[in-house]
């Protein structure tokens, strides 16, 4: 089996940077050497990484590979190759495809496609609906990375808007629940208001006004409340307001059942309308 030595790199891993070397055997990391440590086994290829950073393959837990059904946009082959080219070696695919990944049959179809076409490691989310929570018990955590829950409308029309269904979802699985949180009632009220003023030609600049800070906060607040009641594992995707941060604990990550993330682009925007 081929052994490759990448030496003299600045290794970035788990929040630390150290000068060292890495030995790859076949497709797996065999040794991580720090400082002046040397491997004792000969290597077939030696790469001098002086002045370079060496990072482990990244995990992207929120991808839209558009396959099946939306491949006029992209597909598993093109997107997984793009991921690999960018240093992303593991992905988790979202369920708002066509058909939606909301049944066990659709899940099997998605996983079969990924197995045959993906250039990187993969898993996928199972999409929640108002009535499919009985299927959660049949999901294998080694095949499914979590339940995707749309608490606000988005691409794919997968909104879950019944309180009874939400309680069944949060109380019906030990899998991570990855939630898209925007209050649909507030969105609808704002949409109706601006459609009265502009008809069907509502300016794009009003997007952050329609999907407002209040809409984000109220939905995230509800998700956190339901997760606490059920002791569910909740992760809120792409929060977009500073106000939402008050909903989360700053306890050590390993102890948390409720977490959140922000997209980097959202750190550079404001809710003010813009051209």
Where are these regions (language model features)?
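N-terminal metal-binding scaffold of metallo-dependent hydrolase/deaminase domains
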Residues: 1-41
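Active-site metal-binding motif and surrounding structural segment of the metallo-beta-lactamase
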Residues: 38-54
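Metal-associated gating/positioning segment near the N- to mid-region
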Residues: 52-117
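Histidine-centered divalent metal-coordination motifs
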Residues: 62-66, 180, 238, 265
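Short catalytic-loop micro-motif centered on adjacent basic/acidic residues
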Residues: 93, 123-126, 233-238
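Histidine/acidic-residue-rich, glycine-tolerant segments that coordinate divalent metal ions
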Residues: 97-108, 113-226, 243, 267
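Hard-cation-handling environments
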Residues: 240, 249-254, 259-267
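Conserved small/polar residues in nucleotide/adenosyl-binding loops
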Residues: 268-275
């Amino acid at each position: 089996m081929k052994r490759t030595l990448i030496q003299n790199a600045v290794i970035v891993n788990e929040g630390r940077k150290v000068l060292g070397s890495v030995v790859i055997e076949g497709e797996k990391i065999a040794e991580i050497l720090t400082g002046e440590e040397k491997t004792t086994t000969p290597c077939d290829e030696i790469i001098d990484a002086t002045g370079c950073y060496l990072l482990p393959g990244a995990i992207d837990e929120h991808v839209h590979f558009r396959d099946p059904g939306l491949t006029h946009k992209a597909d598993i082959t093109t997107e997984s190759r793009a991921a690999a080219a960018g240093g992303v070696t593991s992905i988790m695919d979202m369920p708002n495809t066509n058909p939606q990944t909301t049944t066990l049959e659709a899940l099997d179809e998605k996983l079969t496609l990924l197995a045959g076409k993906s250039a990187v490691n993969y898993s996928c989310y199972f999409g929640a609906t108002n009535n499919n929570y009985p299927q959660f018990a049949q999901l294998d955590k080694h095949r499914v990375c979590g339940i995707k829950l749309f608490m606000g409308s988005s691409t794919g029309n997968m909104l879950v808007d019944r309180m009874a269904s939400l309680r069944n979802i949060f109380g019906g699985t030990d899998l991570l629940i990855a939630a898209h949180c925007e209050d649909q009632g507030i969105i609808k009220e704002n949409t109706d208001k601006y459609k009265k003023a502009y008809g069907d030609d509502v300016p794009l600049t009003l997007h952050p006004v329609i999907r407002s800070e209040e809409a984000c906060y109220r939905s995230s607040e509800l998700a956190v409340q339901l997760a606490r009641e059920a002791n569910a594992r909740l992760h809120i995707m792409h929060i977009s307001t500073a106000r939402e941060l008050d909903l989360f604990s700053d306890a050590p990550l390993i102890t948390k059942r409720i977490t959140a993330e922000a997209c980097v682009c959202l750190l550079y925007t404001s809710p003010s309308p813009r051209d």
